[in-house]
């Protein structure tokens, strides 16, 4: 059934390709008519780092990716080695994190009508903090699992909100280059930080899992607050 569903999605995407071509053609004609079809400048990495707040937003994105990917890859191991669940149950419960992200992204779409990007990011950070604390303190297995869901829910609005806020913080003319580097920093965080926690877990213990997430959450919070101060965009 899963393969049939995936084949169906692929077919829909292929069929819809001509629609995208028509859209871009109309957009190009509209830009040419209005005289606004100029190519945006491509900034070098050095130029991006010189923009006030750019370095901080890159490291904030790096830290977010560290939180999300470490949670997704190490949650089941934490449930087995620290909370004592069987491998089968841990694998099932670890999916709660992804359920949290999925549900959270859907809910975020409606909340954005009321909150701006910075408020969405702060909301996500607050929810992650509650989830991390629920896993740190010995409130029992049920609360720890709830914390895992909350971490997923908190992660949901941050990724899209950081990207969406980039033009407001740095200007539309610079946003294309900055978003490209943001993606690079996100992938670096994704690739490096989960294995780094593996080294910590092997050397010290997997009990540091929620603390590890909390450290990156704090860094992300302070980095984004610095972005707000430097760009004067709340």
Regions from the language model: what does each represent?
Residues 1-19, 210-226:
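Symmetry-related core transmembrane helices of the 12-TM Major Facilitator Superfamily/SLC fold
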Residues 19-44:
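Flexible cytoplasmic inter-helical loops of multi-pass small-molecule transporters
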Residues 51-95, 99-102:
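Extracytoplasmic gate region of multi-pass secondary transporters
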Residues 105-116, 201-202:
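Helix-to-loop junctions at the C-terminal end of transmembrane segments
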Residues 119-134:
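Structural signature of the two symmetry-related core transmembrane helices
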Residues 131, 142-150:
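Paired small-residue
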Residues 157-170:
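Intracellular juxtamembrane helix-capping segments at the cytosolic ends
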Residues 169-206:
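A late C-terminal transmembrane helix in Major Facilitator Superfamily
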């Amino acid at each position: 059934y899963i393969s049939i569903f995936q084949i169906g999605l692929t077919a829909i995407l292929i069929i819809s390709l001509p629609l995208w071509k028509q859209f871009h053609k109309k957009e190009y004609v509209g830009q040419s008519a209005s005289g606004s079809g100029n190519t945006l400048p491509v900034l070098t990495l050095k130029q991006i780092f010189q923009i006030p707040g750019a370095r901080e937003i890159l490291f904030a994105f790096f830290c977010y990716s560290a939180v999300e990917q470490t949670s997704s890859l190490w949650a089941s191991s934490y449930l087995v080695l620290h909370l004592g669940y069987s491998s089968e149950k841990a694998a099932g419960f670890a999916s709660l994190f992804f359920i949290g992200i999925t549900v959270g992204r859907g809910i975020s779409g409606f909340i954005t009508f009321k909150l701006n990007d910075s408020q969405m990011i702060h909301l996500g950070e607050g929810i992650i903090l509650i989830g991390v604390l629920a896993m740190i303190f010995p409130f029992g297995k049920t609360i720890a699992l709830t914390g895992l869901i909350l971490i997923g829910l908190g992660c949901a609005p941050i990724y899209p909100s950081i990207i969406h806020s980039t033009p407001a913080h740095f200007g539309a003319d610079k946003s294309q280059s900055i978003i490209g580097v943001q993606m690079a920093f996100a992938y670096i965080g994704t690739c490096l930080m989960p294995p780094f926690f593996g080294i910590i877990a092997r050397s010290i213990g997997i009990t540091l899992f929620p603390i590890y997430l909390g450290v990156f959450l704090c860094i992300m919070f302070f980095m984004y607050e610095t972005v707000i101060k430097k760009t004067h965009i709340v």
